[in-house]
Design a protein with these regions (language model features):
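Short glycine-rich substrate-engagement loop in P-loop NTPases that contacts/grips substrate
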Residues: 49-77
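Conserved catalytic/switch belt of AAA+ P-loop NTPases
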Residues: 93-114
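Hydrophobic anchor at the beta1->P-loop junction of P-loop NTPases
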Residues: 25
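N-terminal pre-Walker A segment at the start of P-loop NTPase domains
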Residues: 1-15
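Conserved lysine of the Walker
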Residues: 33
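Accessory nucleic acid-recognition modules appended to NTPase machines
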Residues: 178-261
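Hydrophobic positions on the alpha1 helix immediately C-terminal to the Walker A/P-loop
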Residues: 36, 40
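Short regulatory helix/loop adjacent to the ATP-binding pocket of P-loop NTPases
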Residues: 120-135, 151-152
Length: 261
């Protein structure tokens, strides 16, 4: 039987409540958001429509069409609309706001659950249009107890491979594991998340910062030492800024030095 994280029960509880808020599953890439939603839907007793938005193809009109289909399911009682990868729909948050408010005025019990692989783009949409209309359900990196129970990780394996469930079966073949992590986690997180948060004038420097900084996980390293390993490209302010963006994207972050003053 597939392992179920705690957030599966949270999702189940929320979608079985009366319609109050849009539920949004948010978290770093490759942490099992879609899987958790699918597991929760297995025990959902009302009609539901589950769709996946596609980059470059799913338009605002497509989103409206899915919503109208779901409204038909809610004609005689509660129903649920699930939209995965909603960040691929241009201007998605304002479209969702309009449709959600229409349902509220009509007294329609259409519940809505949204997910997306880009936590940063989801958060951007929430800040723009949906204030007061949503609740977040966190999908964090997997903890050591979860990885130990689900995949048989030792503590050393967890510290080395991290809390990424999709990559866990590949850990015996480190080259294959690394290719997967680069293609599915690292590069998308840098290009589609971190670089979308703020202007990045030197994308290659950000990539180099990650590749140089990652081996220092859990260790002290100064910005000046990092700069030296980056061949003195950039400056400490740029490095600090890029590190913050990588942290917001959920792949690498730094701890500030403690100052009792």
């Amino acid at each position: 039987m597939a392992y179920k994280r705690h957030n599966v029960s949270v999702i189940m509880e929320r979608i079985n409540e009366q319609r109050r808020f849009i539920q949004i599953v948010i978290g770093p890439r490759q942490t099992g958001k879609t899987t958790a939603v699918s597991q929760a839907l297995e025990d959902f007793e009302h009609p539901f429509l589950s769709v996946i938005a596609t980059k470059g193809e799913s338009t605002a009109d497509w989103l409206r069409a899915q919503w109208y289909r779901a409204r038909q399911l809610a004609g005689s009682g509660p129903a649920l609309l699930v939209i995965d990868e909603v960040q691929f729909v241009p201007n998605w948050s304002s479209v969702v706001k309009t449709l959600w408010d229409e349902d509220a005025q009509a007294g329609l019990d259409l519940r809505v659950l949204l997910t997306g692989s880009s936590a940063t783009l989801i958060q951007e949409g929430l800040d723009e249009s949906l204030a007061g209309r949503f609740e977040l359900i966190e999908s964090t990196h997997w903890t050591y107890p979860e990885c130990a129970e689900a995949f048989g990780y030792s503590l050393d394996e967890y510290l080395f491979f991290g809390g990424y469930p999709g990559a866990a079966p590949l850990r015996r073949d480190r080259r294959r594991w690394l290719r997967y992590m680069n293609a599915s986690v690292i590069e998308p997180s840098i290009v589609n998340d971190a670089m979308r948060l703020s202007e990045v004038r030197n994308p290659e420097l950000m990539r180099r910062l990650f590749s140089v900084g990652a081996p220092y996980s859990g260790q002290e390293i100064s910005y000046r030492k990092l700069l030296g390993q980056l061949d003195d490209r950039g400056n400490t302010a740029t490095i600090a800024h890029y590190l913050k963006l990588l942290g917001d994207a959920g792949i690498m972050s730094g701890l500030q030095k403690y100052d009792p003053k």
